[in-house]
Amino acid sequence: MRKTQPKKIPLAPDPKFNDRLVTRFVNNLMWAGKKSGAYIIFYDALDKVAKITGESGYDIWKKALTNITPGVEVRSRRIGGATFQIPAEVRADRKVSLSIKWMVKYSRDRNGRSMADKLANEIVAASKGEGASYKKKEDTHRMAEANKAFAHFRI
């Protein structure tokens, strides 16, 4: 194990919304180092979201991310030969990372023509409290609730 925590690399805000969270999302969306392509997909998806909902695509995306952000998760801990799933609160930076990764993963898994279409549909679904990424958050919370009896163990 390393002795010190590595320094966080400061991210540059994105050109359109001047938001570091957008850059973080685009970095996860990026495929094979093609960042400009990832930005095009993201902005295109937000335009499609705005067209579908009639509201700002950026605001809907923020709401969708908030909706799929997990509060608790289960972590495995081996105690006396048995492995227990112990519920634990999720750190703030991990919350954001998980929600971004889930949205990108389940957007890729969707059926659709282009990645922008699939991402737009997942954003709209997540903002309404539907979709695969929202279901993942609910499943995570359900697992933590089911294993509440082991919450007294330390992680």
Predicted regions: what they are:
Residues 1-32, 36-39, 43-155:
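Strongly charged
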